[in-house]
Amino acid sequence: KHSLPDLPYDYGALEPHINAQIMQLHHSKHHAAYVNNLNVTEEKYQEALAKGDVTAQIALQPALKFNGGGHINHSIFWTNLSPNGGGEPKGELLEAIKRDFGSFEKFKEKLTAASVGVQGSGWGWLGFNKERGQLQIAACPNQDPLQGTTGLIPLLGIDVWEHAYYLQYKNVRPDYLKAIWNVINWENVTERYMACKK
């Protein structure tokens, strides 16, 4: 069974950029619901497999994608953030960003634009294209997981569902995007980058 991962910091640790109320609801209610619903869906899926009921298996796939994606995405998101975050990455990741986007500022602009531009709910991502050996920016709707739907390996995810920012930033998604750069955990993003290069 899947379980809700602990946050590596307190709910209030990302203040003033993301307030404690948002973090508490987002982690203990929203992410917890994805985990619970994923477990229920997987149980039903196992039953359908055991019975050889292909129709039931197909019917369960949207719930598997939505709740499984929600669990995968949020598990990455919490580690991508840190009260000691912000600034720029260092070393090989910074070099790769400059190579693939021209500069760190241009990369920030592109990922911000992709995230702000998501229609409705979804995610903005920095991913790694293993075949090309390149960093790429992508946007995914709803809880579609990056790797499962695009093949890109997720390095940095920005949640642009309204539950991620509305209580603090209301309908002004660009203000939330400006703020989140102050808490990006570049050490975590770099670890992910180095791991997928092996």
Swiss-Prot record:
Its cofactor is Mn(2+). Mn(2+) binds at H26, H74, D159, H163. Binds 1 Mn(2+) ion per subunit. The keyword Mitochondrion applies. GO terms for molecular function: manganese ion binding; superoxide dismutase activity. It catalyses: 2 superoxide + 2 H(+) = H2O2 + O2. The modification N6-acetyllysine is found at K44, K51, K90, K98, K106, K178. Pfam families: Sod_Fe_C, Sod_Fe_N. Its EC number is 1.15.1.1. The keyword RNA-binding does not apply. Keywords: Acetylation, Manganese, Metal-binding, Mitochondrion, Nitration, Oxidoreductase, Ubl conjugation. Belongs to the iron/manganese superoxide dismutase family. This is Superoxide dismutase [Mn], mitochondrial. It comes from Macaca mulatta.
